């Protein structure tokens, strides 16, 4: 995933309006789980959402990428972070809110993997809690023929330029990111392939239901990709 580019992640995504996204997250939680005190962010990345939620909740994070997690731990040294796969991590306790944002669920490349991830997150969700999952694109919403546009960002001692080309193979979308990283005296180039599954709204809804959740889709969501808002369809027992 972001194995090569973790150091440039925050610079590249500085265009994201994290404060506005977190304000909407808070609003949803206040209306769906007003007594919520604890929050787990699955696929937490570098911890930017969590850094803005820490004043409202006792927070923890899970991510599969060691490089991103290292940055999150540096940003929030007093926050528990756990290295793990969203399908299989087990913290042995439940949270009032579970989030999985910025289309991270898309890295599940089969609907079976989506179900395993949702079921595992549901096992970490308190009986009266709320789960927020930001989806990736549907099969008819991903355009592999878009015109590549450069994303240019500045950081501490570097300038990074990223472009990508895209392809679709059945239900898999692949984005090959090309990076040019300029530092004093040199320019490096590398690529990363990001493969994400393409699933319909009906397929996602069925996966939530199979995981024991009642889910509704806010079509706009946090940044135009939609947002699934889910609750337990029946009481759940703590993960063991």
Language-model regions: role of each:
Residues 96-112:
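A short SAM/SAH-binding and catalytic strip from SAM-dependent methyltransferases
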């Amino acid at each position: 995933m972001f194995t090569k580019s973790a150091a440039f992640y925050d610079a590249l995504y500085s265009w994201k309006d994290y404060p506005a996204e977190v304000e909407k997250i808070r609003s949803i939680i206040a209306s769906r789980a007003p007594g919520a005190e604890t929050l787990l962010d699955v696929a937490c990345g570098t911890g930017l959402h969590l850094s803005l939620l820490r004043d409202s909740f006792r927070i923890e994070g899970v991510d599969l990428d060691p490089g991103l997690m290292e940055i999150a731990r540096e940003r929030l040294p007093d926050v528990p972070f756990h290295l793990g796969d969203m399908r299989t991590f087990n913290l042995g306790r439940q949270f009032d809110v579970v989030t999985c944002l910025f289309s991270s669920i898309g890295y599940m490349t089969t609907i079976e993997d989506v179900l395993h991830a949702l079921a595992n997150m549901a096992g970490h969700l308190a009986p009266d809690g709320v789960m927020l999952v930001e989806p990736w694109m549907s099969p008819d919403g991903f355009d592999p023929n878009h015109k590549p546009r450069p994303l240019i960002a500045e950081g501490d001692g570097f300038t990074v330029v990223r472009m990508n080309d895209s392809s679709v193979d059945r239900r898999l979308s692949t984005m090959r990111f090309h990076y040019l990283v300029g530092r004093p005296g040199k320019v490096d180039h590398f690529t990363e392939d990001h493969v994400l599954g393409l699933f319909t709204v009906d397929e996602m809804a069925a996966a939530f239901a199979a995981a024991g959740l009642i889910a509704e889709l806010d079509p706009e969501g946090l940044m135009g990709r939609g947002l699934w808002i889910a609750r337990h369809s029946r009481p759940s027992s703590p993960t063991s």
